[in-house]
UniProtKB/Swiss-Prot annotation:
It comes from the Eukaryota. It is found in: Plastid, Chloroplast; Plastid, Amyloplast. It comes from Solanum tuberosum (Potato). Its EC number is 2.4.1.25. This is 4-alpha-glucanotransferase, chloroplastic/amyloplastic. One of its GO terms (biological process) is carbohydrate metabolic process.
Length: 576
């Protein structure tokens, strides 16, 4: 509404009459000349003028008072992003990587108006049994997945020759064993050339190796990998006792016999780190924040456990006393038995949670913000005796709670974490999350099976929250819709203002983006409207997961129309 002063109503021809004033009276203009004091808000929201408080009732504000508009807190900015793991990029060598397609994807995100890119854990994926390709069963909590190293980038660095690159492998599914056979020898060759070279790149490698934040985990990881490569056993539990228990003389012998392997391992980690930094720097130049993902637990057969046995609940021989899992939930009637060793939280607290401080520091080196998977485990965790075969036989135990995050805050500073608070969420989990001001999660696919009180429905969302159409553990929107009971379908269509079934992917995306939650995340499969065959993971199943890729026939250059459609939705709901 336009605001006019009273003087705008006086005709220009109007002549003010002369009014008689008493003698000996000092004339005062009815409109005194205004000074322009500097006002500001203090932390409590009151006006301050130097040492003066709010002007007295009836006094004049400065003439620019109408320009004192409220300013939005930058932390309240509404954002949107895409969930897409780098392995899912299209590309010529059977797996997405940190090469040209990563930069094209960031260009696409920028075109779409997105300011977030969420990835799954970047750790080396599991290789044993049903772990094949799983970033949540990683071999090390801090190392990077070297299969993500781009061969084209190695050519640009002069570490590979163009004629050494393999023939294109056009496949829409990642076969991790096949890809390892193709890429590992070439990445090893590049690492050897780097080690034998001189110049700036070699100097960067040496600086990487000497960095205390890197060496705190890198040396243990390298020794572990070297022993694992030379000793043919299922886990470190079966290693010869001097190696199993890290006797100094045994480790010195490993260094002498496996020095080349250790040096190559470290060089490969450097190459991963270097390529990831280039991708992250480019993301920043586009105004895009990268959100990582951190599993709460680590695998038993890992340098994390081998080098830090006192931080885990192991028996005297080094075998887990109890292991991780969750009780029965929407994904499994008997619960999920994850099998990871559990932390000895009492021992960790005694040394200031140093293991977790180092892990969080590493995450901040890789990501702008990150999700912690199974956040509820910090309040209370499900513990299953290691001899049991099903998770339902476990019991709840008290977690570390706020003292852990106090120690992290003191050592690392403020961190931007997202608390994955799905599943069985008790009041202590809610209070812990709120005490550290971490946003929780809502998933629209969980919203329509009950009543209006369902916390996943958009009208029940909170501002400090991240809303997903679905996560990596959910089906795609199209696949979810195809198997949804008719009653739930009716609920969805009614809630989304009677959209057509053909528009269900767009409808649910709009449902997420229109939420009051500050952050909305959409899996790339949903942007493309894909079905169940493009699902990333089916919880509690053993095979066929983590392999989906954007079809090799598709390029981000050909997805401008999808980007513009998404941008229109984001603009409508204030997320640009």
């Amino acid at each position: 509404m336009a605001i006019h002063t009273c003087f705008s109503l006086i005709p220009s021809s109007f002549s003010s009459p002369k009014l008689p004033y008493p003698k000996n009276t000092t004339f005062q203009s009815p409109i005194p000349k205004l000074s322009r004091p500097t006002f500001m808000f203090d932390r409590k929201g009151s006006f301050q003028n130097g040492t003066a408080a709010v002007p007295a009732v009836g006094e004049d504000f400065p003439i620019d008072y109408a320009d004192w508009l409220p300013k939005r807190d930058p932390n309240d900015r509404r954002r949107a992003g895409i969930l897409l793991h780098p392995t899912s990029f299209p590309g010529p060598y059977g797996i997405g990587d940190l090469g040209p397609q990563a930069f094209k994807f960031l260009d696409w995100l920028h075109l779409a108006g997105c300011s977030l890119w969420q990835v799954l854990p970047l750790v080396p994926p599991g290789k044993r049994g049903n772990e094949d390709g799983s970033p949540y069963s990683g071999q090390d909590a801090n190392c990077g997945n070297t299969l993500l190293i781009s061969l084209e980038e190695l050519v640009d660095d002069g570490l590979l020759k163009m004629e050494e690159l393999p023939e294109p492998l056009p496949t829409d599914r990642v076969n991790y064993s096949t890809i390892s056979e193709i890429k590992d020898p070439l990445i090893t060759k590049a690492a050897k050339r780097l080690l034998s070279s001189e110049g700036e790149l070699k100097d960067q490698l040496e600086n990487f190796r000497r960095d205390p934040n890197i060496s705190s985990w890198l040396e243990d990881a390298a020794y572990f990998a070297a022993i694992d490569n030379s000793v043919n056993t299922i886990s470190w539990y079966d290693w010869p006792e001097p190696l199993k228990n890290r006797h100094l003389a045994a480790l010195e012998e490993v260094y002498q016999s496996e020095k080349d392997f250790i040096d190559i391992f470290i060089a490969q980690q450097f190459l991963f780190q270097r390529q990831w930094k280039k991708v992250r720097d480019y993301a920043r130049s586009k105004g895009i924040s990268i959100m990582g993902d951190m599993p709460i637990y680590v695998g038993y057969h890992s340098a994390d456990v081998w080098a830090n046995k006192k931080q885990f609940l192991l028996n005297r021989k080094g075998f887990p006393l109890i292991v991780s899992g969750v009780p029965p939930d929407a994904f499994s009637e008997t619960g999920q038995l994850w099998g990871s060793p559990l932390y000895d939280w009492k021992a960790m607290e005694k040394d200031g949670f140093s293991w977790w401080v180092r892990r969080i520091q590493r995450a901040t080196d890789l990501f702008d913000e990150f999700r912690i998977d199974h956040f509820r485990g910090f309040a209370g965790f499900w513990a299953v005796p290691s001899e049991e075969k099903i998770a339902i036989l476990g019991r709840w135990k008290v977690g570390p709670g706020k003292p852990l995050f106090d120690a992290i805050l003191q050592a690392v500073g403020k961190i931007n974490i997202i608390a994955e608070d799905l599943g069985v969420i008790t009041e202590d989990v809610v209070q812990l999350r709120k005490s550290i001001e971490a946003p929780g999660m809502a998933v629209l696919q969980f919203a329509f099976g009950s009543d209006a009180e369902n916390p996943h429905l958009p009208h029940n969302h909170e501002q400090n929250q991240v809303v997903y159409t679905g996560t990596h553990d959910n089906d795609t929107i199209r696949g979810w819709w195809d198997t949804l009971p008719q009653e739930e379908k009716s609920n969805v269509l009614k809630y989304l203002s009677n959209i057509e079934e053909e528009e269900i992917s767009r409808g649910l995306i709009e449902g997420a983006v229109s939420s009051v939650a500050r952050i909305a995340i959409i899996p790339m499969q949903d942007v493309l409207g894909l079905g169940s065959d493009s699902r990333m993971n089916i919880p509690a199943t053993q095979f066929g997961n983590w392999s989906w890729r954007i079809p090799s026939s598709t390029s981000f250059d050909n997805l401008d129309a999808e980007a513009k459609k998404l941008r229109d939705i984001l603009a409508t709901y204030g997320r640009l």
